[in-house]
Amino acid sequence: MPRRRRNTVSRIWSSALNAIDIECPARLHLGFIDPGASSGRRFGSLGLALDGLGTHLRVQRVRTAREAYFAAGERAGAERERALACLARLRRAFDFDAPLAIELLDAIPPHAGLGSGTQLSLALGYAVARLAGRDAAQRRIAQHTERGARSGIGIGVFEQGGFVVDGGRAEQTAVPPIVARHPFPAAWRVLLVFDAMHAGLSGEAEASAFRALPPFPARDTERIAALTLMHVLPALAEVDFERFGPAVTEIQARVGDHFAPAQGGRYASPRVARWLDWFAARGAACHGQSSWGPTGFVMTASAEEARILIEAAKAARAADDPVRFRIVAGRNAGARIVESRDGAPMHAS
């Protein structure tokens, strides 16, 4: 009998419920398997949850007639309008009008290819659903918040963390199902390459780009599927970075070249592209772009290898180069959720 996949969302709660605190991870989207549906299912995605970079919010009932919103930090403040728009959709979906305070303590950089919108929507959706006494299943919330139309990766990392693969969409699919999940090796690292001067495609611009692209070649789908099943996933199971890295890089090249007409090249940001070429010339075997970018990544087999690369890059970077670097690990757990109702509802000022 197949073993049931473990949901690694961590929840802590008390017997009564008044407030919910959620911290959920950013993710890399490592490419589509079949955006042209030549296999009979469309899209199919590979992704990885990231540790040390995520969205953290707290939602609490308040004694006030109007909504209260609190934000801490530049990234969190920039997400105010998106959070309130998402809340409005959730209120309609759940027919729930109790006043709430939202404190956004940290946020994934928006429009950077790291899943900021999906994680914010899932976290806020879970909190509102629980406070409203409604179904808090992530796939239901994704539908209410108009997430997961093309990829189930964001939902997968919210629920489980780790390295996940979704099975794409059939005609009746609401949200693409997660069909494989492996823990990301603890020793491996991800060096992120940020370009704050460039924004990846999203919303209607993203939808228009998909419509304008030519059909995805069936031979590329066949190759990416083979790389995923026979290289990437076995390499994770066997902690074999030498097999894993080149397979991910090849997937990235095939997908990036297909999307090049929409994003201006294999990578969206010319600055990030130059740095990825720079890392590759120094032996980095695993590199690419997350989603529509502009964030690029280099994966390494150890923290020391990542440290050597980032120190060399910082030494070579010009003073006026806006590109920044950061080393993170993979995250093998989903969202951390604390539910509580200790004392009376807070008063919002």
What are these regions (language model features)?
Residues R4, V9-A112, Y126-Q138, A149, ...:
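ATP-binding N-lobe of GHMP and related small-molecule kinases
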Residues R11-E23, G31-I33, S38-S45, A137-A285, ...:
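ATP-dependent small-molecule kinase catalytic core of the GHMP/sugar-kinase superfamily
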Residues R61-R63, I224-A226, G288-S290:
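Short, flexible turn/loop "capping" segments at secondary-structure junctions
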Residues L114-Q138, V157-G168:
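DPxDG-like acidic metal-binding loop motif
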Residues L114-S116, L120, D220-E222, A285-S291:
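Short glycine/threonine-rich catalytic loop with a Thr-x-Gly-x-Asp
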Residues G265, S290-F297:
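Small/polar glycine-rich anion-binding or flexible loop at a beta-alpha turn
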